[in-house]
């Protein structure tokens, strides 16, 4: 076999493996109740206390395990995040089920992608206090919205939030309906992915799925 042919086979095989990699799905059923889930790291953008991310039995259920951010610190500019330790993604589809339980300052839940550190990443979030979904970038710890859509986000109800990132193009679905379609070039390189809340938002998360390309 010619050297360049062998090289092409290696490259094609690698590309094929990346393209057909199975999605990562975390349903928290194998994690210990009362402890942080394995495979995540935790951080906080802004002030106030660190987030408290623990696995609990779903409120009102007998046995379904969920990830809960349960710290109710009232600091307004406070954004607890939980990101997967492994994996770095540029083009990716993220999906999560989330249920806002409480929050006087806010009731926001979101998805994070192209995460560099606690002060630099993209986020899309839906808010049961404001009844809207928004895309932001957080740069050097400062959050800026670049697209917003008003939609009902009932408290104590499960919702499905989905985000697809392809290059500089981001599409967001809320409960099966496309609500946001935006472009931004702030972060072009791959980064980590994860979950987000704000202020005193107490949120349950389940079935976090990461489908990279």
Name each region found by the language model:
Residues 33, 70-139:
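Secretory/extracellular carbohydrate-interaction modules
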Residues 28, 94-96, 157-172:
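Short tryptophan-centered beta-strand motifs in secreted/extracellular beta-sheet-rich domains
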Residues 33-68, 74-78:
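Extracellular glycan-recognition surfaces and repeat-rich motifs
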Residues 168, 173-194:
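Short, solvent-exposed beta-strand-to-loop segments that form ligand-recognition rims
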Residues 80-86, 147-153, 194-195:
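Beta-strand-rich interaction surfaces with strong enrichment in secreted/lumenal proteins
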Residues 8-16:
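Bacterial N-terminal signal peptides
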Residues 23-27, 187-213:
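Ligand-recognition surfaces built from glycine- and aromatic
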Residues 139-160:
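Short, aromatic/His-centered strand-loop micro-motif at the edge of beta-sheets
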